[in-house]
Design a protein with these regions (language model features):
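Phosphate-binding site recognition
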Residues: 1-141
């Protein structure tokens, strides 16, 4: 039997599911989120309560640039095949986490924030060349 690893400090859903870490299935939360109909969901939890892991799970579920069915195999969300067909890997996702932005001073924290935003811009730079309709452009203006 394969030894499972503890995911201490690992907040990447794909890494946890692919590399044999223990994972407590919270994928049912996706269905609850979708059924709530809320325009905005605010997650207020203390540090180290899985907020970034939850965001990573959502990104992997919705991201149109990926096919992540294998990551969700055996999880609660896959029991709802209609929901998965309609929502899974069907939408563009921009993922930005500030979990690594901290510092011993304002200047240090600002430098980390600038670095994080710079990396974010590099990852999604290709979007500058995407053709958009006027209506689509109005959403981001």
């Amino acid at each position: 039997m394969k030894q499972m690893k503890l995911s201490v400090g690992v907040s990447d859903f794909e890494k946890i599911r692919s590399d044999g870490y223990y994972y407590i299935d919270k994928s049912g939360w996706i269905k609850g989120l979708l059924k709530s109909g809320a325009e905005v969901t605010l997650l207020t939890r203390p540090r180290r309560f899985g907020k970034t892991l939850g965001m990573s799970m959502l990104a992997n579920f919705f991201d149109i640039t990926k096919d992540n069915r294998a990551l969700f195999e055996g999880l609660e969300i896959m029991k709802d095949t209609e929901l998965c067909q309609h929502w899974m890997n069907q939408y563009p996702v921009l993922f930005l986490s500030f979990k690594d932005v901290d510092g011993t001073s304002f200047e240090n924290a600002l430098a980390l924030l600038q670095f994080t935003l710079s990396q974010f811009c590099d990852v999604y730079a290709y979007l500058e060349d995407v053709e958009c309709t006027d209506q689509e452009r109005s959403y981001i203006a």
